[in-house]
Amino acid sequence: MELKRLSISWQFLIVLVLILQSLSALDFDPYRVLGVSRTASQADIKKAYKKLAREWHPDKNKDPGAEDKFIQISKAYEILSNEEKRTNYDHYGDAGENQGYQQQREYRFRHFHENFYFDESFFHFPFNSERRDSIDEKYLLHFSHYVNEVVPDSFKKPYLIKITSDWCFSCIHIEPIWKEVVQELEGLGVGIGVVHAGYERRLAHHLGAHSTPSILGIINGKISFFHNAVVHENLRQFVESLLPGNLVEKVTNKNYVRFLSGWQQENKPHALLFGQTPAAPLLYKLTAFAYKDYVSFGYVYVGLRGVEEMTRQYNVNIYAPTMLIFKEHINKPADAIQARGLKKQVIEDFITQNKYLLASRLTSQKLFHELCPVKRSHRQRKYCVVLLTAEANKLSKPFDAFLSFALANTQDTVRFVHVYSSRQQEFASTLLPDIEAFQGKSGVSILERRNTAGRVVFKTLEDPWTGSESDKFVLLGYLDQLRKDPAFLSSEAVLPDLTDELAPVFLLRWLYSVSDYLSDFWESLLHSNWREMMPLLSLIFSALFILFGTVIVQAFSDSNEERESHPPDKEEVPEKAGKTEPSFTKESSSKIPKKGFVEVTELTDVTYTSNLVRLRPGHMNVVLILSNSTKTSLLQKFALEVYTFTGSSSLHFSFLTLDKHREWLEYLLEFAQDAAPIPNQYDKHFMERDYTGYVLALNGHKKYFCLFKPLKTVDEETVGSCDLDSSRGKPPCGLGPKPLKGKLSKLSLWMERLLEGSLQRFYIPSWPELD
């Protein structure tokens, strides 16, 4: 009886769970969210998703519920666009990312938990990101927001970004620490962001985050991952490590004069913070990064020996943080603040009010736009008093007088600037009426910009500026008239753009780029996972495989060439009846170069295709014509003549036996204009024509050849007459080695002309067969 009751109770519980599961499934229906039917095609689903995504995107729709609606739309499309997930949802009602029976049971239990316990905070497991009350929701990032706002803003302040997702126990574990760090760092000026990997997969993949939780920093558009334990101090040190190391200079009594005098070269005010800690505070470093283009920052540790001289000179209270701003005068600060706890807003307001020198030098068009903005209305007029001076007069009396005048007449509507005439010649010549009258002297102009295209109205003092009291009186009178009548600026011109004087040269920019690339590579090599490193490793191993493969093939090729280069012990020399071949002495044989010096192959029907017909483009085969009787002597001379040209990999060397392939040679010579008198085949001396010593340079790809024809000597003509007598039955005359070697005496000069491309080329329609 008890077993029966227990069985009924279990059945009732299972039915109750299934009913609750069915009810919970109604909470989220991807078909209902996208407004499509269950039989909709992928094209219809995609079309509906694009329409709803454009309508409910948080960047375009300002409705308070737009973000939640957009998340539901993305989640619905993620399920229905994947056939496997769509089938799983249709069969089991699984609307999440988990698949399979085990995941399905977990999903059903989760929805049962959410419907049975109405307050999920009872168990303190905030798995559902749509319902949890977390600090992350305030900092959620979308891809467009990241690209259009976070990346450009990272050039002014670093960003700390966390990658999270649903069902992430580690994310829950680090949330208290994350909340504490965010509250501190955001107050110091660090940007905060959170990316939900489930809904912003594109952004998570773009950031290179393949696991959750992940924490990364972004500065100057560069991404750096956090790899230490998630504790407060480590995260603070990570943010500090993102900042460049040269933002704040350590200043002591030995180098403070040099530091403050840097305004002349850097064209910036210089800030000094006197603090009681050995290192500069993080707030000060973040401020230095935000205003690095406008102010140079230094830090003085008041506990260092010898600093008393500085604190006494500038009247600094060493028991409270003190910040001083120096401009053109290094003996007295232009402004100062002192407080027990310097806040971010106080420091930013202080720096903003002192971003520029009293009389800044116009070094770029960007600075010109900031100091002399375009007039927007009659109440927002901005005038610029420009001192056009030579660079050598920077510290002279006229410049000092201009500074003192600027200090005494500082107004919201008037800016004082100066320009080096030698560096901005076009700009100076436009404002000065008579450039020759102001040669080597200073001039002062008052101008007002009318538009961004460079149109200005101006008035230039007639006489050069010497800094005298009369000059100051005249300039003050001009400003008084301008205050009463804006039309006082009677001249009009279009100013050319200023040259950027402080821009780094190309070599420095290239070195900076290489340095950044190497640092990024080293960072990824140390900390990236295998998924990120696989393409790089594949490229490296492929390059190494090709390199070593080429070396091994070349080594085997060289060994084969050396093996084939050993000459045979004896050279077969055919003998003719009634003729005695000349014997080589040891002295003459020692002059024969080793076969390894010049590799000469015989051109036969076997090697004809590879050595000529299918020769690679740009390669040529230099062929020596010889007979069986002249083979040894001509090859010896040929090797000596072409030895200096064997360094070229595009030249190949061969020899052709005249006794075997006379017809092939006669066919080629027919295309050579006056290269040699071609005998008629009915001539009785047709087969007696001597072509030994001829050399042909054959270009197999372009189908042309160049011809070397040896010059006949007196000895050769005598030998020729002997050959005629031999044909009549008389004994032939002997042909010594000297006349044969003389045939190729001019070959080296011919080879030089061949490489120069100055030889005559004889083209043929196609290469004949070599029988």
UniProtKB/Swiss-Prot annotation:
Disulfide bonds: none annotated. GO terms for cellular component: endoplasmic reticulum membrane. Residues 116-244 form the Thioredoxin domain. Keywords: Autophagy, Endoplasmic reticulum, Glycoprotein, Membrane, Signal, Transmembrane, Transmembrane helix. The keyword Signal applies. Residues 560-579 have a biased composition (Basic and acidic residues). It is found in: Endoplasmic reticulum membrane. Glycans are attached at N628. The chain crosses the membrane at residues 533-553. It comes from the Eukaryota. Residues 26-532 are cytoplasmic. InterPro entries: DnaJ_C16_autophagy_reg (IPR052448), DnaJ_domain (IPR001623), DnaJ_domain_CS (IPR018253), DNAJC16_TRX (IPR043361), J_dom_sf (IPR036869), Thioredoxin-like_sf (IPR036249), Thioredoxin_domain (IPR013766). Residues 554-771 are extracellular. The keyword Endoplasmic reticulum applies. GO terms for biological process: regulation of autophagosome size. It is a single-pass type IV membrane protein. Its main location: endoplasmic reticulum. Residues 1-25 form the signal peptide. Residues 559-590 are annotated as: Disordered. Residues 29-93 form the J domain. SUPFAM superfamilies: Chaperone J-domain (SSF46565), Thioredoxin-like (SSF52833). Plays an important role in regulating the size of autophagosomes during the formation process. This is DnaJ homolog subfamily C member 16. It comes from Rattus norvegicus (Rat).
